[in-house]
Amino acid sequence: MASVKDRRVESPATDTDLGRGVFEFSDRYSVFDWGEMPDHVPGKGASLCTMGAYTFEQLAAAGVPTHYQGVRTPDGETVRLADAPEAPTQMVIDLTQVPTLPFEDGSYDYDRYHDAGGSNYLVPLEVVFRNAVPVGSSLRTRCAPADVGIDADEWPQGPVELPETIVEFSTKYEEQDRYLSRSMADEIAGDADIAELDALARRVNETITDCAADAGFVHDDGKLECVYVDGEVRVADVAGTFDENRFRFDGREVSKEAVRQFYKRSDPEWVGAVKDAKRAADERGVADWKSLCEPSPDPLPPEILQAAADLYAAGANRYTAREWFDAPPLGDALDAFE
């Protein structure tokens, strides 16, 4: 489960105090939980850092607690996004404890995770909020339309709006994402309260949805991570980016989902092998599903790689209402994926 960003510790967290760290955003990307893909998308790291910082500052204005402290400039200062001289690639954050999640005898040991984390830890869940069901949503494989209030026997081919926002919980540190019942999520969350995580996710969703609307986007869904500190849950990791959220512009996908869908069309052998390997790993009770997947992904064609770079850059310009990047109109970048 390789990340697209690196975490640098400047002062470590302890049982009683938060630390200080820096996210260094790279141009790496990952689809289908593969980890680092063959290509790097030029400028992607700066795009994600810029959008994430913008979102965190909007959340702060709305009174939502987060771990964000600012962005790091080339000369080492920590400033608000508006004061950054160029699109940043480093984000300064409060650090909490992130214990190792043990895997033994075919299962994960969350009791040991929480014993190590105490009352200051990263909640080992992803909190997912859904306003709509786009083409690539896992909800389409896990639920019938009627289960989520949609009056249809089968899922429509295009995105479909939900009658009300849905909040779900999935595992964070397992080799495969696993959606959970509320009771199981509550158990895995430790001292963090599921109702508070749900409420926090809805506040984050509202803020990102408003930011998206101001930029001419439709916000379909997203995910967030949270820290639990001194009895309070706060937004962690990064939020409101094209990797954590799915948006639409003029009815077309504006997120990492565009690359996922390209791979489904252009490299179905690898996509199918990933699915089969995950299923086999579940059946065998092993964590490392990639060792069961023989094919590797093909590199992106040069024109698609450039289109992905343009998507991230042009989309970040639009979302933040500032021309950070020299990029073509967003619609032109999206044309290449069709």
Curated annotation (Swiss-Prot):
GO terms of biological process kind: 'de novo' IMP biosynthetic process
Pathway: Purine metabolism; IMP biosynthesis via de novo pathway; 5-amino-1-(5-phospho-D-ribosyl)imidazole-4-carboxamide from 5-amino-1-(5-phospho-D-ribosyl)imidazole-4-carboxylate: step 1/2
Keyword ATP-binding: yes
Pfam families named among the record's database cross-references: SAICAR_synt
GO-annotated molecular function: ATP binding; phosphoribosylaminoimidazolesuccinocarboxamide synthase activity
Catalytic activity: 5-amino-1-(5-phospho-D-ribosyl)imidazole-4-carboxylate + L-aspartate + ATP = (2S)-2-[5-amino-1-(5-phospho-beta-D-ribosyl)imidazole-4-carboxamido]succinate + ADP + phosphate + 2 H(+)
Record keywords: ATP-binding, Ligase, Nucleotide-binding, Purine biosynthesis
PANTHER family membership: PHOSPHORIBOSYLAMINOIMIDAZOLE-SUCCINOCARBOXAMIDE SYNTHASE
Family under the similarity heading: Belongs to the SAICAR synthetase family. Highly divergent.
Name of the featured protein: Putative phosphoribosylaminoimidazole-succinocarboxamide synthase
Organism for this UniProt entry: Halobacterium salinarum (strain ATCC 700922 / JCM 11081 / NRC-1) (Halobacterium halobium)
Organism phylogeny: Archaea, Methanobacteriati, Methanobacteriota, Stenosarchaea group, Halobacteria
